[in-house]
């Protein structure tokens, strides 16, 4: 009896999953990768790369908090489905002297593109700085929160070649 229930529910899930996936791509939400990648060409000090292992984690959450139209997805495959909208974002530069507290201001640059049905419809570059009496990684997390808020506002009225942040 239990095996029949398990097999039956598995079959229903398998049959329904293509429809659920298709609905998620067209429900009007903008897909954003749940971890922001660092560009392969990014200018980031080696000690910051090594120490700040969570760099890029806060930015997508901040975008989602700032825009009710955003849904986070775990994989590149789910991000770039053929229908609907998705936002690609990558970290392109981090300016941070040393990797400790009290080492001056930290800055982060990101760029992103809004894609709709496979075509870019808008893009941006954004930069923010922060200074606080804390370590480099937590200061950069604050810049991610600020950048996420900027990007969330931009998503309400996205335009090509936009400049965001405090640049």
What do these predicted regions represent?
Residues 3, 35, 51, 58, ...:
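Glutamate identity and glutamate-enriched acidic tracts
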Residues 8-69, 91, 125-127, 158-167:
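A structural "domain/chain start" motif
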Residues 1-9:
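Bacterial N-terminal signal peptides that target proteins for export
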Residues 44-48, 117-161:
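Short secondary-structure boundary motifs at beta->alpha junctions and helix caps
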Residues 10, 20-21, 85, 106, ...:
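Generic hydrophobic/packing signal
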Residues 49-55, 106-111, 143:
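Short, low-complexity, polar/charged sequence segments that are solvent-exposed and flexible
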Residues 4, 13, 23, 80, ...:
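Sterically constrained small-residue positions within well-ordered secondary structures
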Residues 66, 70, 75-121, 127-134:
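Surface-exposed short loop/turn segments
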């Amino acid at each position: 009896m239990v095996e029949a229930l398990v097999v039956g529910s598995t079959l229903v899930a398998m049959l329904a999953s293509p429809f659920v996936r298709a609905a998620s791509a067209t429900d009007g939400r903008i897909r954003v990768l749940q971890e922001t990648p660092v560009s392969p060409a990014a200018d980031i000090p080696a000690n910051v790369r090594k120490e700040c292992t969570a760099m890029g984690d806060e930015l997508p959450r901040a975008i989602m908090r700032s825009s009710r139209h955003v849904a986070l997805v775990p994989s590149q495959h789910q991000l770039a489905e053929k229908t609907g909208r998705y936002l690609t974002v990558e970290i392109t530069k981090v300016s941070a002297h040393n990797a400790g507290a009290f080492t001056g201001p930290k800055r982060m640059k990101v760029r992103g593109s809004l894609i709709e049905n496979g075509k870019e419809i808008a893009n941006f570059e954004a930069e923010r700085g922060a200074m606080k009496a804390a370590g480099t990684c937590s200061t950069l997390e604050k810049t991610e929160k600020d950048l996420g808020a900027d990007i969330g506002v931009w998503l309400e009225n996205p335009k090509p070649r936009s400049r965001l942040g405090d640049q």
